[in-house]
Amino acid sequence: MGKHLDSGSKLLDLGTENPFTPQLKAAGYSVSNTQGENLDDDFKKIAQTTCDCVTAFEIFEHLLAPYNILKELKSDKLIASIPLKLWFAEAYWNENDDWDKHYHEFEPKQFQFLLEKTGWKIKDSEFWTSPDQNKIGIRPLLRYFYPRYYIVYCERMQ
């Protein structure tokens, strides 16, 4: 974050307070989280919020239509991370909780296209793995080598 945002920047973090919130505040950022609104239905109200940067850590895969909020955001900067689609694992789906389902697990090119179509230009990005050290098997082994998460820093195209 410090690579792209000054300490003291005002952030709108899409999603309820999470483990990153206190870390961001400790680093000097002013953080406001959404309060559990349905971001598919209430995106216009949220998108009007004034801030230096919108952050979205593993949020867009939970939306039926992430295009809408991405298109409407008034911020000029966006930092977003997503879980990537893995060829050896099914998408996450909690049968008991409609808020805890992945409607999308993107390939990098799909997320990049979504961002481009909603007016964002990726300026920086990183991939990282998510090894599960407590399990034995082919899939846990593959998680050491295949990126599981993708994070981007974007700026609004003029």
Please describe what each predicted stretch is.
Residues 1-9:
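Conserved alpha-helix/loop element of class I SAM-dependent methyltransferases that forms part
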Residues 3-4, 18-23, 64-158:
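S-adenosyl-L-methionine-dependent methyltransferase catalytic module, highlighting the catalytic core
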Residues 8-17:
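Conserved class I S-adenosyl-L-methionine
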Residues 12, 32, 123:
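Conserved beta-strand positions in the Rossmann-like core of class I SAM-dependent methyltransferases
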Residues 55:
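A conserved beta-strand element that flanks and buttresses the S-adenosyl-L-methionine
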Residues 58-62:
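A short His-aromatic
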